[in-house]
Amino acid sequence: MASAELDYSIEIPDQPCWSQKNRQGGKEAGKQQPVVILLGWGGCRDKNLAKYSAIYHKRGCIVIRYTAPWHMVFFSESLGIPSLRVIAQKLLELLFDYEIEREPLLFHVFSNAGVMLYRYVLELLQTHQRFRHLHVVGTIFDSGPGDSNLIGALRALATILERRPAVLRLLLLAAFALVVILFHFLLAPFTALFHTHFYDRLQDSGSCWPELYLYSRADKVVSARDVERMVEARLAHQVMVRGVDFVSSAHVSHLRDYPTYYTSLCVDFMHNCVQC
């Protein structure tokens, strides 16, 4: 079972509160219990994700929370090592372990760390026979995705490492900067032969369900322009997309600064996606 090998949290409400209506007669045909998978930002703790989880759990959704290890996000991905693909497969296998694979599925993805993992989820949904029939209804992106932004990535990594000894912190930051400069700038043409950057992969994704992008021009980690370019690219692929600029909130701080508005955006999006 994937659940024995993955450090995740799951919340299952006692009763589903979603009715699935028969479109012709208007009679209740059964119960839907949407599943929401939260993919956390780099260095995110489960207690941080739990605040977002509550938005959905209170409304009768099953919620799975997971944050990829920071060393995989910052180093494995930068080196072109697809170790997150294994995690993505285990996450999707959880749906079968809990026998919820037939329920509507929504992703809520945070920052580039969440997007890097989500990228492999998308690939598995399109290529893996077992996952091709999962019913994904929508994706929310919070504070991402961002294109190659070394300064922003260093800021994010510095935040994760702030409790580490100063010497170790400086060594890891220097090592990360060197890897990015080498593989994403100097050797970019060679790297592209065996590893496509997650931002480029997401731009050209074949997924067709609605997407909601929540970002801010005050974000110092992920550029608002990167998010807006992604919105434009997805619209060009005829995907139903909406972008919301919170203007003044910092990276992954939109819920904290605008709790009512943020919650209403997420809940309304979920309702619309599940009922389509």
Swiss-Prot record:
The chain crosses the membrane at residues 170-190. It is a single-pass membrane protein. Expressed in liver (at protein level). The keyword Phosphoprotein does not apply. Disulfide bonds: none annotated. Pfam families: DUF829 (PF05705). InterPro entries: AB_hydrolase_fold, DUF829_TMEM53. Disruption phenotype: Knockout mice do not display severe skeletal abnormity at birth, but exhibit late-onset short stature. They show craniofacial dysmorphias, including hypertelorism, thickening of the calvaria and minor sclerosis of the skull base. Platyspondyly is also observed, as well as short limbs and underconstriction of the diaphyses. It is found in: Nucleus outer membrane. One of its GO terms (cellular component) is nuclear membrane. SUPFAM superfamilies: alpha/beta-Hydrolases (SSF53474). It comes from the Eukaryota. Keywords: Developmental protein, Membrane, Nucleus, Transmembrane, Transmembrane helix. One of its GO terms (biological process) is negative regulation of BMP signaling pathway. Belongs to the TMEM53 family. Negatively regulates bone morphogenetic protein (BMP) signaling in osteoblast lineage cells by blocking cytoplasm-nucleus translocation of phosphorylated SMAD1/5/9 proteins. PANTHER family: TRANSMEMBRANE PROTEIN 53. This is Transmembrane protein 53. It comes from Mus musculus.
